[in-house]
Design a protein with these regions (language model features):
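N-terminal pre-ligand scaffold of iron-sulfur
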Residues: 1-63, 81, 95-118
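Mid-chain, well-packed structural core segment of small domains
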Residues: 58-88
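Short, P/G- and charge-enriched loop/turn segments at secondary-structure junctions
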Residues: 8-9, 87-89
Length: 118
């Protein structure tokens, strides 16, 4: 069984962009958000640590672009785009669940597992 969740072309994800893909084999219908910030790709489960609801339904609205933070559509919680830690809102100090990302040969690969910091 593979740990790979998604493989996408690098050019599909621009700086301060976000894409949403299905999380395979989950009974809850969870999705994965893939973001690019300061050139680095990161992936998060689309679930707010405040109440488990989706951060967004449309990735075009995930970013709070002035502050360059990820924003939950429900309670406007703001998350650090590098660490996933909530900086403002009802879940301050809690973190999004991150996934492993690797960008190589013009492809972004998202895999199950906890990412290394950075």
């Amino acid at each position: 069984m593979s740990n790979v969740i998604a493989i996408i072309k690098s050019e599909e994800l621009v700086e301060l962009g976000a894409l949403m893909v299905d999380l395979p084999q989950n009974a809850d219908g969870l999705k994965v958000l893939i973001t690019r910030f300061e050139g680095k790709v990161r992936a998060w489960i689309n679930s707010c640590p405040h109440d488990g609801s989706p951060l967004c339904r449309d990735p075009a609205f995930l970013w709070e672009k002035r502050k360059k933070l990820l924003q939950c559509m429900n309670h406007q919680a703001l998350f650090n785009a590098k660490t996933g830690i909530c900086e403002e809102g009802p879940c301050k100090g809690k973190s999004l669940y991150g996934l492993i990302t690797k960008e190589k040969n013009n492809q972004i690969i998202v895999s199950k597992g906890e990412p290394k910091n950075g």
